[in-house]
């Protein structure tokens, strides 16, 4: 999977420590990856995905509700709905809840329509109560099948 990703300028490529490694979902080969992520930004949203702190801007702990990844993708296929597996780490520890898939924080579906660049805001992780996330170092990883296809490290201040 590294060769198709390398030809796209991607700000997170060096951050994805597990790119091309085997995950726990199985059943997907590198040739079946439907798109590559060319940009990944994180924003602070409410439970309805209204933006509280814009994607790519400073995130302040006292305002945090849902940490939401926004991905820009370059499709290899024309159409389809694809399940992504999302990992959210705080200070190196995977965040998971009782309904989280094993080894992941949550899942999100994206629907590709056409071959042009597309942007998706994935569901966030958090609470409707402001101040949910504390200061620290965080990282989102986006997985498709066995492959880490994007990652972004960020801070909550």
Residue ranges: model-predicted function:
Residues 27-37, 44:
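Proline/serine/threonine-rich low-complexity linkers at boundaries of modular beta-sandwich domains
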Residues 93-105, 148-150:
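Surface-exposed loop/edge segments in extracytoplasmic proteins
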Residues 46, 90-94, 146:
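Solvent-exposed strand-loop boundary residues in beta-sheet-rich modules
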Residues 2-4, 128-153:
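Short, exposed beta-strand-loop hairpins at the edges of beta-sheets
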